[in-house]
Amino acid sequence: YLNIWICKIQPTTIFGLTIGQVLGIAFPPNGLDHWPKGVSAPTAEQDGVVIDFRAVGSNNPNTVAMPGGTGNLTIKGRTSVHEVGHYLGLRHIWGDGGFLGPNDCAQSDGVDDTPFASAQSSFDCEVTKNSCEQVEAFYNDDPLDLVENFMDYSQESCMNMFTKGQAALMRSVLMGPRA
C-alpha cells in the first residue's frame, strides 16, 4: 500500500552549489486542489516515501549539517512522519513560499486550521514566533506559527502534532486518491 525506501540520499546540488542534505522525499497524489499541477510522482514506481538512513529511528544519535552551515539538526526520527504527511497530501505549513511561490504570508497550505507563516522556521523551535497577522481568520485571535507541527522545518525535538484539519485531509486522501 505504501512503499518506503531507506537509502543514502546525497546532498542536493543545484547549478554546482551544494545547498544541503535532504532527509526525505515524497510526492502527493495527483489532482489535489491545494497543490500545483505536476508535483505528483513522475511514475508509479516512484510513488512512495524515500528516507535517508540517517533520519530513521529516535534512538539513532545522528546530527545532519543544516543548509548554509548554520548548525546541525539532531535527528529524532520524525522525518518519516513529515514525508508520509506529504504522501497523504499535506504541504508545508508555510504553503511552500520560497519553494513554489513568493516567501510571504499569502501562501497557504490548503488547510483552514493551520495559521499562515511567512516561511519555514529555519530548524528552530521558537514557540513565540508570529510571522503573519491574520486576526480575522482565527476568531479575533492572532495565532503563533505552528513550529510544533510535523509539516514545518523546526528542530525534530519540537515537532509533535498535526492539526485536526490536517488529520481530516490525510484521512480524505486515504479514502480517495490513495484508497
PLM regions with names:
Residues Y1-D124:
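Metzincin-family zinc-dependent endopeptidase catalytic domain
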